[in-house]
């Protein structure tokens, strides 16, 4: 999409919507001003306004789901970049000459730490590794593996599942270190379905991340889990619209309940 022009440039999964002036179309129908924003950026803005990023100036969010989305907030504003593709952090290279990502590039973070490729790596390991595993028993019974099964097996001490999980955490830690080296944000926020693993994600990730970080006092960028769950995108989209009206970012924290889980 083009935020500046209010256009859909290309939707690979929905043919026929190329170069669609969406904002103009909806604005004419509704007789109201319309703004356009990427869903990952909107979710990051929601967390910045009244979630895990409330009160900071600079924040980077990674959304860990079937893929890895991201949003970058710099001095309270969404960063789009010159070509409006400045927040594709799921496609930063974390393994030179690594495995091929769906985007066509080799070694992308998404290829190593998303839920989709976590499951694919587990399936591949089950074929090449003879160790007993509850994951193997699940596949024999005809059950399709997903990331939740891998996390649960890891919690139970399954060696193969732990290998799969810690591999994903290693590459995610590399991605977080790269973010710190480039942006030096106040914090990194993690969202998406994988964050439901809670401390089973945050503890090993933080240990690996801290081992790679600068050994300087007071420069450790914290990694936090998102607080708004699936509401973040809606809240952020409302914030984008509110800000576009010239009213400044809203304070919506008084209307929020306890932290939500991702769906």
Cite the ranges covered by each PLM segment:
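Gly/Ser/Thr-rich active-site cleft segment
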Residues: 1-22
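Structural signature of FAD isoalloxazine-binding scaffolds in flavoprotein oxidoreductases
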Residues: 85-88
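Generic enzyme active-site microenvironment
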Residues: 37, 45
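A cytosolic small-molecule/anion-sensing beta-strand core signal
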Residues: 4, 38, 74-75
């Amino acid at each position: 999409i083009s935020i500046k022009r209010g256009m859909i440039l290309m939707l690979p999964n929905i043919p026929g919507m190329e170069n669609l002036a969406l904002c103009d179309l909806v604005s004419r129908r509704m007789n109201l001003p319309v703004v356009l924003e990427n869903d990952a950026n909107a979710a990051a803005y929601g967390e910045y306004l009244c979630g895990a990023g409330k009160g900071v100036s600079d924040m980077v969010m990674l959304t860990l789901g079937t893929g890895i989305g991201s949003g970058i907030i710099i001095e309270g504003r969404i960063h789009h970049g010159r070509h409006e593709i400045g927040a594709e952090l799921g496609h930063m290279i974390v393994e030179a000459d690594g495995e091929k990502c769906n985007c066509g590039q080799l070694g992308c973070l998404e290829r190593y730490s998303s839920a989709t490729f976590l499951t694919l790596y587990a399936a591949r390991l089950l074929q090449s590794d003879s160790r007993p595993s509850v994951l193997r028993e699940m596949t024999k019974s005809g059950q399709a593996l997903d990331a939740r099964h891998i996390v649960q097996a890891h919690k139970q001490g399954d060696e193969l599942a732990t290998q799969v999980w810690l591999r994903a955490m290693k590459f995610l830690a590399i991605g977080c270190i790269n973010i710190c080296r480039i942006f030096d944000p106040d914090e990194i926020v993690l969202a998406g379905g994988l964050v439901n693993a809670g401390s089973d994600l945050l503890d090993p990730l933080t240990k690996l991340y801290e081992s790679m970080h600068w050994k300087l006092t007071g420069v450790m960028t914290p990694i936090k889990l998102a607080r708004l769950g699936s509401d973040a995108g809606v809240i952020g989209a409302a914030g984008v619209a509110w800000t576009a009206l010239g009213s400044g970012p809203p304070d919506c924290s008084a209307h929020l309940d306890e932290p939500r889980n991702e769906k």
